[in-house]
């Protein structure tokens, strides 16, 4: 593995790169946070300095997303996978059902976890039939009668697909795993009852999950809920029911301020769409590389591509790593390549990758 004395372009799907200026700010405050004489890592979660960090981060997030007051914002410990259990526990009672769109591995895992405890849950779409290259159009007619909610994964990191527009439902609340795209574009927030996201793509370090839910649509359920999965309990305690991942919350807060300085989600969406278009255009015009995802379903966060000559794959990855392009190997179950170009990936990183791909094709095509 090569060694570098400078920052490289990190295309890993997650944990992913953070904005350099956020890292620099965290570095400057690491040993002595704003005159406290200690690091945020050492700080009690019960004292005023951390409470200020927590409150500011939530306030900034609310501003970025234009959240109505009825929506709660809660930080949960652990990864988004914990919410695969927490959501059914909070929204289903014994005998209840809900609907899932199985658009990839993570939606399938969430479905299987819910079905362990609530055997009546249903799938309304199985993307395995198209090798997860397509997404459904979901309307009220798609949703089963009696479904307590409709669950989607908004962006699929493994396959490079996403919903360009979201379902607008009256029949059932919409719940979305947005781990790999939250804060990358504007959202019609009031169309969702729950949005959750692991932090490690666009928010901050791993080990933290953000849950946003409509308090008016949180039902009373007929069973006890484990404390660290209980939405109402965690919200009542201000994300401090237990010791939270304090440093991850601090970094998330710095990221939110960075996004505000950049102009908010409208600017991020414009930038991300431009980055993705550049890369897809380069792939589509290549005679060596190709993108397997149909245009209407292509993700702006995770650009999946392959080679017509898979005998060159290992050479491409090796040379890419040597030249400072990390994390381009595709997910282990699908192979090929994947460039994750989250908010923190600068446009010049995409431009540099395109130049490298073109040079590789000239030398090996």
UniProtKB/Swiss-Prot annotation:
Q: In which pathway does it act?
A: Amino-acid biosynthesis; L-serine biosynthesis; L-serine from 3-phospho-D-glycerate: step 2/3; Cofactor biosynthesis; pyridoxine 5'-phosphate biosynthesis; pyridoxine 5'-phosphate from D-erythrose 4-phosphate: step 3/5
The cellular location(s) given in this protein's UniProt record come to: Cytoplasm
> Which reactions fall under this protein's catalytic activity?
O-phospho-L-serine + 2-oxoglutarate = 3-phosphooxypyruvate + L-glutamate; 4-(phosphooxy)-L-threonine + 2-oxoglutarate = (R)-3-hydroxy-2-oxo-4-phosphooxybutanoate + L-glutamate
Q: Which GO terms describe its cellular component?
A: cytoplasm
Which residues are L-glutamate-binding? 46
GO BP field = L-serine biosynthetic process; pyridoxine biosynthetic process
Q: Which Gene3D superfamilies match?
A: Aspartate Aminotransferase, domain 1, Type I PLP-dependent aspartate aminotransferase-like (Major domain)
> Cofactor binding mode, per the note?
Binds 1 pyridoxal phosphate per subunit.
The Swiss-Prot or TrEMBL record lists the needed cofactor(s) as: pyridoxal 5'-phosphate
**Which HAMAP family is this protein grouped with?**
SerC_aminotrans_5
**What does this gene product do?**
Catalyzes the reversible conversion of 3-phosphohydroxypyruvate to phosphoserine and of 3-hydroxy-2-oxo-4-phosphonooxybutanoate to phosphohydroxythreonine.
- The protein's name: Phosphoserine aminotransferase
Q: What is the lineage of its organism?
A: Bacteria, Pseudomonadati, Spirochaetota, Spirochaetia, Leptospirales
């Amino acid at each position: 593995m090569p060694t570098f004395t400078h920052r490289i372009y990190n295309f890993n799907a997650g944990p992913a790169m953070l904005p350099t200026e956020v890292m620099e700010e965290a570095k400057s405050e690491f040993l002595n946070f704003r005159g406290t004489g200690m690091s945020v890592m050492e700080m009690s979660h019960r004292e005023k300095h951390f409470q200020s960090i927590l409150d500011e981060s939530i306030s900034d997030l609310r501003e970025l997303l234009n959240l109505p007051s009825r929506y709660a914002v809660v930080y949960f410990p652990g990864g988004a996978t914990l919410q695969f259990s927490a959501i059914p526990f909070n929204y289903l009672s014994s005998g209840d059902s809900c609907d899932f769109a199985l658009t990839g591995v993570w939606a399938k895992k969430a479905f299987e976890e819910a079905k362990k405890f609530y055997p009546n849950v249903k799938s309304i779409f199985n993307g395995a039939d198209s090798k997860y290259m397509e997404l459904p159009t979901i309307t009220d007619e798609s949703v089963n009668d009696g479904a307590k909610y409709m669950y989607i994964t908004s962006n699929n990191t493994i396959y490079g697909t996403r919903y360009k527009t979201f379902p607008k439902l009256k029949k059932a609340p919409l719940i979305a795993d947005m781990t790999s795209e939250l804060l990358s574009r504007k959202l019609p927030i009031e169309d969702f009852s729950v949005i959750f996201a692991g932090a490690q793509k666009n928010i901050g370090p791993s080990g933290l999950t953000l849950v946003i839910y409509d308090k008016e649509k949180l039902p009373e359920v007929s069973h006890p809920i484990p404390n660290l999965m209980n939405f109402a309990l965690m919200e009542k305690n201000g994300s401090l029911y237990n010791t939270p991942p304090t440093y991850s919350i601090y970094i998330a807060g710095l990221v939110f301020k960075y996004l505000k300085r950049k102009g908010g989600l409208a600017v991020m969406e414009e930038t991300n769409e431009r980055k993705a278009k550049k890369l897809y255009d380069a792939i589509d015009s290549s005679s060596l590389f190709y993108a397997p995802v149909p245009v209407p379903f292509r993700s702006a966060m995770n650009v999946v591509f392959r080679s017509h000559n898979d005998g060159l794959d290992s050479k491409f990855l090796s040379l890419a790593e040597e030249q400072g392009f990390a994390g381009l190997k595709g997910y282990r179950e699908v192979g090929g390549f994947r460039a994750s170009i989250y908010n923190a990936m600068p446009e010049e990183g995409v431009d540099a990758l395109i130049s490298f791909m073109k040079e590789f094709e000239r030398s090996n095509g």
